């Protein structure tokens, strides 16, 4: 790219500049295509890593200090959605989307479990503020997030990446959402449960 910039200084004619511009655009598109391919490749690898495998066992407390484990939800669909931080804008939006659709999740024989690295006290405040009807689990020892490999270092603190796992009634992971849109994620997961249930 630097060579093209140098050549454009030497090149005086309009035709020469147009040719250099075309070459520059071509190189940019090639780099974009390569990056896009890398993103899709990571997504496919992630699906292969988790789909079809048994979900890891866990035992975590919710916002009311009640314990939850994988085994107690056998026979139900489990939406295990990890989010970075209580009260952050994206996490608030995502939780509200699950709240709105929660009655439909119940009708679909599904339980929604939010998970972050915040503690029980933080979860309690967050849940009360939003009026959440479902459990949010405190993984403040990073036990579950580490099993899924989604702990992210953020300066001196750690957060869970915004990723979700859909677990079928037998305890098998059927989908891994590693790219989440907080506005539409809940609706997407609900649609997938209904699709997989047919």
How should each PLM-predicted stretch be described?
Residues 55-56, 77, 161-163:
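Short loop/turn microsegments at loop-to-beta-strand junctions
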Residues 1-61:
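N-terminal targeting signals for export/organelle localization
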Residues 58-77:
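A short beta-strand-turn-helix
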Residues 71-93, 98:
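Short active-site neighborhood of thiol/selenol oxidoreductases, capturing the structured segment around
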Residues 159-198:
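Thiol-/selenol-based redox modules, centered on thioredoxin-like
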Residues 92-132, 143-146:
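Structural microenvironment flanking redox-active thiols in thiol-disulfide oxidoreductases
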């Amino acid at each position: 790219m630097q060579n093209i910039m140098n050549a454009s200084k030497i090149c005086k004619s309009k035709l020469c500049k147009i040719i250099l511009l075309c070459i520059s655009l071509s190189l940019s598109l090639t780099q974009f295509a390569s990056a896009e391919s890398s993103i899709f490749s990571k997504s496919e690898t992630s699906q292969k890593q988790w789909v079809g495998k048994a979900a890891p066992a866990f035992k975590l407390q919710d916002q009311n200090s009640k314990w939850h484990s994988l085994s107690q939800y056998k026979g139900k669909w489990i939406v295990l959605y990890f989010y970075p931080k209580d009260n952050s804008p994206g996490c608030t939006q995502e939780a509200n989307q699950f709240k709105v659709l929660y009655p439909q999740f119940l009708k679909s024989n599904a339980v929604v479990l939010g998970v972050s690295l915040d503690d029980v006290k933080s979860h309690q405040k967050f849940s009360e503020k939003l009026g959440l009807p479902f459990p949010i689990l405190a993984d403040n020892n990073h036990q579950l997030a580490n099993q899924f490999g989604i702990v992210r270092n953020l300066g001196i603190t750690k957060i869970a990446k915004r990723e979700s796992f859909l677990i079928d009634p037998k305890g098998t992971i059927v989908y891994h959402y590693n790219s989440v849109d907080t506005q539409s994620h809940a609706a997407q997961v609900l649609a997938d449960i209904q699709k997989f249930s047919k």
